[in-house]
Amino acid sequence: MSLAMTAFRMMAVALVVVVASSTTWARSLEGSSSPVTSLTRGRSLNKRAAFDPSCTGVYDRELLGRLSRLCDDCYNVFREPKVAMECRSNCFFNPAFVQCLEYLIPAELHEEYQALVQTVGK
């Protein structure tokens, strides 16, 4: 067997080892391999799980997203960890949300946002 052929085989074996170990490593990053996890691919079974359970009104992802983005923007302005949590508490019906609204949103849109809070928080 020539030296070139031996080197080629060693490179092929090394490549197989790298691919196999990276696949195993990627699987370990996915977390648990329980049947539920594999069926849902890690997604929540409860579609409301990402939002405050105190929001008992109309479930509308777009509305909740708009309200949540306001809280995110407020956090990005003030960089206080509690701002984002307080803003979302009680389904956006709180003084922190009102302060964020007054600071970030033009006054002519305040009533619209208050109506959104009423819609999702009934």
Curated annotation (Swiss-Prot):
What this protein is called in its record is Crustacean hyperglycemic hormones 7
Entry keyword set: Amidation, Carbohydrate metabolism, Cleavage on pair of basic residues, Disulfide bond, Glucose metabolism, Hormone, Neuropeptide, Secreted, Signal
- Organism, by scientific name, is Penaeus japonicus
Q: Which cysteines are joined by disulfide bonds?
A: 55-91, 71-87, 74-100
Tell me the protein family, please. Belongs to the arthropod CHH/MIH/GIH/VIH hormone family.
One Pfam family of this protein, by short name? Answer: Crust_neurohorm
The protein's location, in the record's own words, is: Secreted
**Which terms in the Gene Ontology molecular function aspect does this entry carry?**
neuropeptide hormone activity
- Secreted as a keyword? yes
Q: Give one GO biological process term.
A: glucose metabolic process
Q: What are the annotated GO cellular component locations? A: extracellular region
